[in-house]
Amino acid sequence: MESPLGSDLSRLVRIWRALIDHRLKPLELTQTHWITLHNICQLPPEQSQIQLAKAIGIEQPSLVRTLDQLEEKGLITRHTCSNDRRAKRIKLTKSAEPIIQKVNNVIHTTREEILNGINQEEIQWLSQMISKLEKNILELYNKS
């Protein structure tokens, strides 16, 4: 019988995410908030919601709810783009900086604990296998 690799990977992602959510709870944030904030930090300043959604790999309507929550928490601002009134630009607030640092510390510590007992060579091998799987999946997806 073949290994249920897809199920195993899905379960791994689910419990990893649950652990991150649990550890970010004292900051009143979730893994989804972290991914969004992380991508805002990685992109050039004042990216549009469309560009951010593409970077994260989700549809724009899915992103709006998360951005609403981050705006309510005072971590981002959104303003209308001057050349396209339909587009919104996203900017981190000053109060986001210390929160992002705390979140990054939680993520870093959690990642180190999860990878405890796995050496760098094994991590590199796993990353290569994941890249191969992703490449194969994307090729299959693009064929259909």
UniProtKB/Swiss-Prot annotation:
Residues 49-72 bind DNA. It comes from the Bacteria. Gene3D superfamilies: Winged helix-like DNA-binding domain superfamily/Winged helix DNA-binding domain. Keywords: Activator, DNA-binding, Repressor, Transcription, Transcription regulation. GO terms for molecular function: DNA binding; DNA-binding transcription factor activity. GO terms for biological process: response to stress. Residues 2-135 form the HTH marR-type domain. It holds the Pfam family MarR. Homodimer. Belongs to the SlyA family. Transcription regulator that can specifically activate or repress expression of target genes. This is Transcriptional regulator SlyA. The lineage of its organism: Bacteria, Pseudomonadati, Pseudomonadota, Gammaproteobacteria, Enterobacterales.
